[in-house]
Design a protein with these regions (language model features):
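Class I S-adenosyl-L-methionine
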Residues: 107-120, 126-276, 280-289
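Conserved phosphate-coordination/catalytic loops
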Residues: 6, 10, 100-101, 220-223
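Membrane helical hairpin/interfacial module
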Residues: 51-82
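S-adenosyl-L-methionine
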Residues: 1-61, 77-118, 242, 253-272, 276-285, ...
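Conserved proline-anchored active-site loop of SAM-dependent methyltransferases
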Residues: 30-45, 70, 116-131, 178
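Hydrophobic beta-strand segments of well-ordered beta-sheets in folded domains
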Residues: 30-33, 62-69, 93-96, 118-122, ...
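A short acidic (Asp/Glu
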Residues: 41-49, 75-82, 131-134, 189, ...
């Protein structure tokens, strides 16, 4: 297992820990889809089922459907059957495998699972536009897409975040998270920065022209966010703290909560000003370049 793959699996698990209890509040149940274009990461799929098993008490009267789509899914399906038998998962947690090309088969597989009327999270590896469109049919809909670096994918959801995971050898994978709900994006960012360090794996913002590498930390280095906030203020003019928190959440790899920490340092340095000049740095405070 490569260090980047290990970090990706932990990111998935940490996000599922947040997504699953919320999704299971839906009276219509929920769907988790795992799709791949080449070969599946069996460890990641097993880890997902183990997370779901931890919430077995919340499955009474609700369903959680796991849909596997891609070439040669039989071995993975058998492995997950074994895991379910080991954990004695309830019948409300079901696994369905569909063999074939991901983009060709995922739309029909999700329709058959009733994914369009309930929470849907799709974990996709190297998926194309058809798969992303299908993943956008849930209510709410979320996708965690892993792909090669380069052109940024454009899922149909309105809230999107991109981050590259870079190994010590320079090998990198692009992770794109997209959702229809703001709380989902916040939960993803929290999971992103809570991942344990993996043998030199670091993050990189694909939209950062300087390509700075960031150590994974609950208190990430603020330098790139500082530059991005200053550039945004220079181009957009004065903005409220709420506006800047939203910018951080949707246009950087950082969490919204990191915004206030950076703004406080900029105010102390005299780089920016605030209106009103005193008091708590609340959401309605207006920030401008000095």
């Amino acid at each position: 297992m490569s260090a980047v793959a290990g970090a990706l699996r932990e990111l998935l698990v940490r996000y599922l820990d947040a997504w699953t209890p919320v999704a299971l509040h839906s009276a219509r149940g929920a769907t988790f889809a795992y799709g791949w274009s080449d070969s599946p990461d069996e460890h990641a799929a097993e880890a997902a089922v183990r997370v779901f098993a931890e919430f077995a008490d919340r499955l009474r009267g609700r369903r959680l459907t796991v849909v596997l789509v891609g070439p040669a899914p039989a071995t993975l399906a058998r492995r997950l059957d074994t895991v379910q038998a080991e954990l004695r998962t309830p019948p409300e947690l079901s696994v369905h495998a569909v063999e074939g090309d991901l983009d060709a088969r995922l739309p029909a597989a999700l329709k058959a699972a009733g994914a369009a009327v309930a929470p849907l999270l799709a974990f996709l590896d190297s998926a194309g536009p058809a798969s992303l469109a299908a993943a956008g049919t849930g209510k709410p809909a979320e996708v965690l897409l892993v792909s090669g670096t380069g052109q940024l994918p454009t899922p149909p959801m309105p809230l999107t975040a991109h981050v590259e995971l870079v190994g010590g050898d320079g090998a990198a994978r692009l992770v794109t998270f997209a959702t229809t709900v703001g709380k989902g994006l916040e939960a993803f960012k929290n999971a992103l920065w809570a991942v344990d360090e993996y043998a030199g794996v670091r993050y990189r913002d694909p939209r950062d022209p300087e390509g700075h590498l960031l150590d994974i930390s609950l208190s990430p280095h603020p330098g790139p966010l500082r530059r991005e906030l200053l550039a945004h203020l220079a181009s957009a003019g004065p903005r409220t703290v709420t506006d800047l928190r939203q910018f951080t959440l949707t246009h950087t790899v950082y969490r919204a909560a990191d915004t206030v920490r950076v703004l406080s340092a900029l105010l102390t340095a005299g780089t920016v000003t605030r209106d009103p000049e005193r008091g708590r740095l609340g959401g309605d405070v207006v920030i401008a370049l000095s």
